[in-house]
């Protein structure tokens, strides 16, 4: 079977709460790091989440 192009990534909160989301991204079409505005339930606000590698 062929290996998938999509790679698992972790989106870490920039608020410093330690909260994160996991998702996948296509490295060929989006080689740059993702930055998304999502809800952080710890601070109960929408903050910027930045891409990090899953260990």
UniProtKB/Swiss-Prot annotation:
Cellular component aspect of the GO annotation: cytoplasm; cytosol; cytosolic large ribosomal subunit
InterPro entries to which the protein is assigned, alphabetical: Ribosomal_bL33, Ribosomal_bL33_CS, Ribosomal_bL33_sf, Ribosomal_zn-bd
Molecular function terms from GO: structural constituent of ribosome; tRNA binding
Assigned keywords, A-Z: Methylation, Ribonucleoprotein, Ribosomal protein, RNA-binding, tRNA-binding
Modified residues (N-methylalanine): 2
TM regions (residue ranges): none
Subunit structure comment from the entry: Part of the 50S ribosomal subunit. Cross-links to the P and E site tRNAs.
Family to which the UniProt record says this protein belongs: Belongs to the bacterial ribosomal protein bL33 family.
Protein's recorded name: Large ribosomal subunit protein bL33
Lineage, broadest ranks: Bacteria, Pseudomonadati, Pseudomonadota, Gammaproteobacteria, Enterobacterales
